[in-house]
Every structure is written in structure tokens, then in C-alpha cells.
């Protein structure tokens, strides 16, 4: 009986509220997006995606989303320049 009362004290956790605190290393972003490290390096430079870290690049969730949007656009046939532009516009539209 005491167990049920303790469980009743808990509320559901919305992980989406905490995603802004999550950061991923380069290799993790590559696995998540399904791209190579060489691609990610190139895209990061071309799209000027901000990263943290000195020895290893660290990507916040905004950067990860940008990478995944670029990947999605490339998978749909856009060249890299157009994919970067599409990702930027998509993110800008969300915040208007």
C-alpha cells in the first residue's frame, strides 16, 4: 500500500522540455543522422553550424536538427547548397 502512495507522488516527465540541455559528440551526431564524419565535418564548415569543444566537436540540439534537416533535403535530391538553404529557411519559419 505504501508503494502505491509513493508512485502517486510522481508526475510524467516531458523530455522535450530538457532537450536544450543535451549535447552530442561528432560520432553520435553521425550515427543519428546516418552520415560519415567526413560529411559532417564538411557540412559543419559549409553551413557554418556552431559547435563547442576544442579537442572534440560538440553539437547542441539546434545544430543536430540542422544537420538532420540537411540530410533530409539531400535525401530528397537537393544539392548541398540548396539543402543548407532549405534547412535554414525551415528553421526560420518555425520561429516566425
PLM feature segments, named:
Residues 53-58:
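Short, Lys/Arg-rich nucleic-acid/phosphate-binding segment
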Residues 1-31, 45-50, 61-96:
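Arg/Lys-rich, alpha-helical DNA-contact motif
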Residues 38:
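Key DNA-contact positions within bacterial/archaeal DNA-binding proteins
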